[in-house]
């Protein structure tokens, strides 16, 4: 029997509650198709609300502190660390990636074989990227068995919604309209795949705040404007003269955008009597200081579909990012990775008992200097957050309803 292909779709910034829920405003027939023909884990916890940290944990099956990604500053994943991508290569898989350039900045695509493994962060599925992906799937360049890591950046803020999805029927916010737009391309992509011989995994690196709330029967929407999105794209067009210089310029432009947006938001909501949650959603950024371990930022979807995955199954037990590749390893009977903290979720899919494991979480590196390292532990029933160099507990949520 030939080895199955593996397609890992990572939708940057996709929250679990915005694609796996009964009350969605987005139109997502293709994500729904994957769920109907697979198993979904809506309570999947990311290690951190930052691409570099989260993807490093996914690819290694290890928490950030075991792979050198728990520092207060951003840096690259060491090429000496064993990843599941290397294991797949050593077991006959051709490894391909289509990922934003931020993945290259942080050493996430070192083990992929194709020379066009990254694209500029500003490039959308609707700017030709979608067609490039489909061309790879149909032109025979992906020699079987293949592992294809596809990282979609269209939902990353600031969002530019394509005109064809700007109608309110596609979503109650820019964020939700963009999910509808991305779903359109997911449909075009899976049309080109043999689902009987391909394992599809759809997840996100982290979630995001969606600054849209209902207040006194009115909608307050503080999502980034189209002009802000244009400025962000301009910043990402800066050529990589050197990785460090380009990153520094991009950080400065990003900081300018965040500061400007924060001032505008503050002026608009200062006089409103908002709850702490409403203030956080409207005012805070995923890139600001603080622990940034609220569920809006770290709870992501996880869907296994295709191949012989049990159909239309929803498993509510909490699972973790670091469990994704141990599950793939188990499904495909690959040699076991020696150094791993994640565990296979296959027993849950087979209706067997698997004890819930606590999820280690941490704040991502801050864009500001002198930020403090904050860590946490999350289960279904509690979340504990503390400063790494202190015994002082910063936050403690003690029951299921208050874990946020």
Functional labels for PLM-detected ranges:
Residues 1-404:
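Catalytic domains that recognize anionic headgroups
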């Amino acid at each position: 029997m030939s080895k199955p292909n593996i397609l890992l779709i990572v939708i940057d910034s996709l929250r679990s509650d915005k694609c796996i829920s009964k009350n969605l405003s987005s139109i997502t027939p293709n994500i729904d198709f994957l769920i109907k023909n697979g198993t979904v884990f809506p309570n999947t916890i990311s290690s951190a609300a930052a691409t570099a940290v989260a993807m490093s944990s996914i690819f290694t099956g290890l928490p950030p502190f075991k792979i050198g990604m728990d520092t207060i500053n951003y840096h690259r994943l060491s090429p000496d660390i064993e990843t599941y991508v290397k294991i797949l290569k050593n077991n006959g898989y051709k490894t391909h990636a289509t990922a934003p350039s931020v993945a290259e900045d942080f050493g996430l695509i070192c083990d992929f074989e194709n020379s066009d493994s990254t694209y500029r962060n500003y490039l959308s599925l609707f700017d030709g990227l979608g067609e490039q992906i489909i061309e790879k799937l149909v032109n025979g360049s992906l020699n079987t068995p293949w592992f294809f890591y596809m990282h979609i950046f269209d939902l990353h803020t600031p969002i530019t919604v394509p005109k064809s999805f700007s109608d309110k029927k596609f979503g109650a916010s820019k964020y939700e309209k963009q999910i509808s737009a991305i779903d359109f391309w997911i449909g075009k992509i899976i049309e080109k795949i043999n689902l009987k011989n391909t394992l599809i995994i759809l997840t996100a690196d982290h979630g995001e705040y969606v600054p849209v709330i209902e207040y006194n029967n009115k909608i307050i929407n503080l999502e980034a404007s189209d002009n802000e999105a244009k400025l962000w794209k301009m910043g990402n067009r800066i050529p990589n003269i050197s990785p460090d210089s380009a990153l520094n310029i991009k950080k400065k432009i990003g900081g300018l955008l965040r500061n400007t947006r924060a001032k505008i938001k503050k002026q608009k909501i200062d006089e409103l009597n908002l709850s702490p949650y409403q203030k956080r959603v409207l005012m805070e950024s995923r890139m600001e200081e603080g622990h940034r371990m609220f569920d809006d930022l770290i709870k992501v979807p996880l869907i296994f579909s295709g191949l012989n995955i049990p159909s239309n199954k929803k498993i509510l037990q909490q699972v973790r990012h670091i469990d994704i590749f141990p599950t793939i390893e188990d499904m495909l009977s690959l040699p076991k990775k020696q150094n791993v903290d994640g565990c296979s979720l296959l027993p849950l899919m087979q209706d067997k008992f698997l004890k819930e494991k606590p999820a280690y979480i941490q704040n991502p590196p801050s864009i500001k200097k002198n930020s403090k390292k904050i860590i946490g532990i999350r289960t279904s029933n509690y979340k504990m957050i503390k400063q790494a160099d202190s015994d002082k507990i910063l936050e403690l949520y003690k029951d299921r309803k208050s874990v946020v």
